[in-house]
């Protein structure tokens, strides 16, 4: 799981970390990458309180390599992350940030979910149960289909 900058990711973090115990993937290690815009005290709380099997770290320069080798990506659906997920053909769950006047992540994730490229957990459904179900669906569907998706900008 990755948070981009991390400044507005608390709902996603709590739901996704809680989803591990409810998912069919509860026996494997989950890695959580939190951006540097989340204050250090909040980051330390996530790191120090993470359940067994969940590794919480700051964002890393080898993110693309991690993404290419992971089973699944959970993110807010930022442009860069989505493009990297599609390029890596990594199964994905999007939990878009939709606070304030933000709508681009939701629109992007809805369109890609409609095309079968990822699962989406909408703003009003962000909890551990919904995220776990989306994780299990994404993994059972396999890698995102890229044929039919216009990746040319």
Role assignments for model-derived ranges:
Residues 1-72, 106, 124-125:
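Donor-nucleotide binding loops and adjacent catalytic segments primarily
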Residues 133, 137-153:
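C-terminal amphipathic helix plus adjacent low-complexity
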Residues 61-105:
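A donor-sugar binding/catalytic signature common to diverse glycosyltransferases
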Residues 58, 94, 120-122:
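Structural signal for conserved beta-strand scaffold positions within catalytic alpha/beta enzyme cores
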Residues 24, 86, 113-114:
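Anion (oxyanion) recognition and catalysis
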């Amino acid at each position: 799981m990755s948070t981009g900058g991390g400044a507005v990711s608390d709902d996603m973090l709590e739901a996704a970390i809680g989803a591990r115990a409810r998912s069919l993937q509860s026996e494997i290690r989950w890695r959580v990458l939190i951006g540097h815009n989340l204050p250090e005290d909040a980051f330390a709380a996530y790191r120090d309180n993470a359940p067994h099997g969940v590794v919480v770290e700051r964002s890393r320069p080898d993110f693309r390599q991690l993404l290419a080798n992971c089973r699944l990506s959970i993110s807010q659906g930022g442009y860069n992350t989505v493009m990297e997920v599609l390029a890596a053909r990594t199964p994905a769950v999007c939990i878009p940030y939709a606070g304030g006047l933000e709508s681009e992540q939701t629109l992007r994730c809805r369109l890609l979910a409609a095309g079968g490229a990822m699962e989406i957990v909408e703003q009003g459904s962000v909890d551990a149960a919904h995220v776990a179900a989306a994780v299990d669906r994404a993994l059972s569907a396999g890698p995102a289909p890229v044929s039919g998706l216009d990746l040319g900008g």
